[in-house]
Amino acid sequence: MPNWCMNKLTIRHDDKSMLDKFEKAYRDDWTIETFYPTPRDPNDPTKLIGEGASFDINEGPDTSWYHWRLKNWGTKWDIGCKDGYGLEPTRVDDELSITFDSAWSPPLGFYERLVVLGFDVQASYFEPGMSFAGTWHNGKDNYYEGNWSDFPEALVDEFDMHEFYGDLEVEDEKM
């Protein structure tokens, strides 16, 4: 079971059909795969590269879907709202906002691909288990780790970090 990284993403695009495509993909739990597909097994295109084969954790991204996704997406699983790890999208005019969980880390490589495809991308993320958070806007990542009370106040409030760490501080004071 992974540590879950909480993510908030807002995208814009001049082409309404690109937002339609993103929203449909997100509702179908096939968001990243739609815009940044994982390579297929050359001998069986119905399978992902290395699917079903055992792999070494030190292998490169050319031999397994797992390594490829970590290198290119920034996380190992796709995102969406159908599986229960994301909320329904909110759309107003040319802007779409989603809130979702990803495994271990935010999908920063996916965000980079969206920018290449003409999206304006603004995101924030928080992983309470490893105590890191950040904001990402069109390629600029502001990353913070360590004590959450040293994070920017807007980020602390956005993810209500007091809910995650407040009880720990009370326990520390008792010791």
Where are these regions (language model features)?
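Long, contiguous binding/interaction regions
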Residues: M1-K174
